[in-house]
């Protein structure tokens, strides 16, 4: 079975859409905080299990019978490393054989403050003894949506990149890559630096 954390989140929903085109629904486990939000998944035949990144025991129970896990990084900045440790420990206790993790583009060299928690998680995975792959996602195109109205109003898009360029990609694009890595064989030990095709 294949499990996805954050399955009802912005990225997780797209991953599930992709995954269900190649994997039978009854072989997919959606790990969610609020099962009420996953009712449509249950109706499709997806196995829905409740767990929170902060509850290692619940995660261990939710991961029973799971062979592969997509660990979608927590959105709680400053808490990610602790929460991800809970997931990795639970995966090990449950006998998960492979974890794909959504990290940060060039996390090992990135000057972004977010990189530290991703690097810590990558190290935990390396030390866990579980086979893993890293999906180092770049900037989400959707991150620009909040600044679209003022940009349209003033006729200029303002960003912090100076003269630099950003090759963003949509969540749907990153999700398609994640679904392939978690559904297919042969990705253990791989690091995928993912971004848009053009800056």
Which ranges hold each PLM region?
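Redox-cofactor binding/interface segments in oxidoreductases and associated redox assembly factors
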Residues: 51, 68-72, 101
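Rossmann-fold cofactor-recognition segment
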Residues: 42-55
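A short hydrophobic/small-residue beta-strand
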Residues: 48, 98-99
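Short loop/helix-cap segments at secondary-structure boundaries that form the rim of catalytic
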Residues: 37-44, 61
């Amino acid at each position: 079975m294949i499990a996805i954390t954050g399955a009802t989140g912005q990225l997780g929903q797209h991953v599930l859409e992709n995954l269900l085109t190649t994997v039978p629904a009854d072989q997919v486990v959606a790990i969610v905080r609020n099962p009420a939000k996953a009712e449509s998944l249950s109706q499709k035949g997806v196995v829905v299990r409740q767990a929170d990144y902060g509850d290692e025991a619940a995660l261990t129970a939710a991961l029973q019978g799971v062979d592969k896990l997509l660990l979608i990084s927590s959105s709680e900045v400053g808490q990610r490393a602790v929460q991800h440790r809970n997931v990795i420990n639970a995966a090990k206790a449950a006998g998960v054989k492979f974890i794909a993790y959504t990290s940060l583009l060039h996390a090992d060299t990135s000057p972004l403050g977010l990189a530290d928690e991703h690097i810590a998680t990558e190290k935990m995975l390396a030390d866990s003894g579980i086979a893993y792959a890293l999906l180092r996602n770049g900037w989400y195109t959707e991150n620009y949506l909040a600044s679209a109205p003022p940009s349209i109003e003033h006729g200029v898009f303002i960003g912090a990149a100076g003269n630099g360029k950003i090759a963003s990609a949509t969540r749907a694009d990153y999700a398609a890559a994640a679904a392939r890595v978690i559904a297919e064989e042969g990705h253990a030990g791989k690091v995928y630096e993912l971004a848009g095709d053009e800056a």
